């Protein structure tokens, strides 16, 4: 039974064909069925008003086993590495990146906390996962972790759980309806167009610190020009006085970095952008 369009809550249209292909691999998997409580939210963002934090989410999938927050990676080739760094090797080309699971797990914890506030203890458990949509082999130290999804079993793991055993809190139709009603209230919304800051397009979240978030970013005009963008957070209920105070603190840090200039171990300051 095909997974119907009515169960997919779509976000922004993706400009990346590999992202669209990865999502379709999930929806077309033979393990998925057009039955409750199955629901999917693709390309959404999660806004936490109390902190001002914003998290990009590739895919959320609801099944009887809970809510799965899935980070999608579509690099081709053979995956090697450990719990810290991953390397994809394909026809002589190598690409190394930080293991994306900790970032996905952080988002899952934020979502779980927001769900707890909206639904109390009667909420689905939130699992973090990483889906490698284009990998040919996995050779990680210690073997394949249970949260790592591959094209051959992505559907079965989302439907049946990572280990195939029933979760302690099974999601029924009533819980599904509560979640659908609460989705907008808890800050889950379709992603806007690509976020731009000072001519740079924000990418992966790499640091989630006290009062700020940092993203990798690419120059929209010169793709090889890459940077890290630090965004200082302003909670939704912040007064004008407190907002001005936070703005001054951000400017002070920018001035300090500008005065340091080039220094080993410290990224060089480029610009301060008001948002």
Q: Locations of the language-model features?
A:
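ATP-binding glycine-rich loop module of kinase domains
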Residues: 211-258
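Short, flexible loop/turn elements at secondary-structure junctions
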Residues: 44-48, 74, 221, 233, ...
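Short beta-strand micro-motifs within the conserved protein kinase catalytic domain, predominantly
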Residues: 268-275
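Conserved N-lobe motifs of Hanks-type protein kinase catalytic domains
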Residues: 260-264
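Short, flexible loop/turn motifs enriched in small residues
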Residues: 54-55, 210-211, 275
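ATP-binding glycine-rich phosphate-binding loop
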Residues: 192-224
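Intrinsically disordered, low-complexity Ser/Thr/Pro/Gly-rich regulatory segments
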Residues: 1-205
């Amino acid at each position: 039974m095909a997974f119907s369009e009515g169960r997919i809550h779509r976000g922004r249209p993706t400009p990346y064909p590999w992202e669209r292909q990865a999502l379709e691999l999930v929806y077309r998997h033979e393990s998925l069925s057009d039955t409750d409580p199955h629901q999917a939210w693709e390309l959404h963002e999660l806004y936490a008003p109390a902190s001002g934090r914003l998290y990009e989410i590739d895919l959320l999938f609801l099944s009887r086993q809970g809510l799965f927050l899935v980070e999608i990676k579509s690099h081709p080739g053979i995956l090697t590495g450990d719990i810290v760094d991953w390397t994809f090797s394909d026809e002589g080309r190598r690409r190394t990146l930080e293991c994306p699971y900790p970032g996905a797990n952080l988002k899952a914890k934020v979502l779980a906390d927001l769900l707890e506030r909206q639904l109390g203890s009667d909420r689905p458990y939130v699992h973090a996962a990483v889906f490698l949509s284009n990998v040919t082999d996995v050779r990680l130290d210690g073997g394949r972790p249970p949260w790592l999804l591959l094209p051959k079993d992505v559907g079965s793991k989302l439907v049946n759980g990572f280990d195939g055993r029933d979760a302690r809190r099974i999601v029924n139709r009533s819980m599904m309806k509560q979640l659908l009603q609460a989705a907008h209230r808890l800050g889950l919304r379709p992603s806007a167009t690509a976020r731009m800051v000072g001519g740079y397009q924000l990418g992966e979240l790499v640091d989630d610190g006290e009062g700020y978030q940092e993203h990798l970013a690419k120059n929209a005009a010169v793709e090889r020009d890459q940077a890290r963008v630090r965004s200082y957070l302003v909670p939704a209920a912040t007064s004008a006085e407190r907002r001005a105070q936070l703005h001054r603190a951000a400017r002070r840090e920018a001035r300090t970095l500008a005065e340091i200039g080039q220094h080993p171990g410290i990224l060089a300051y480029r610009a301060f952008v008001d948002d």
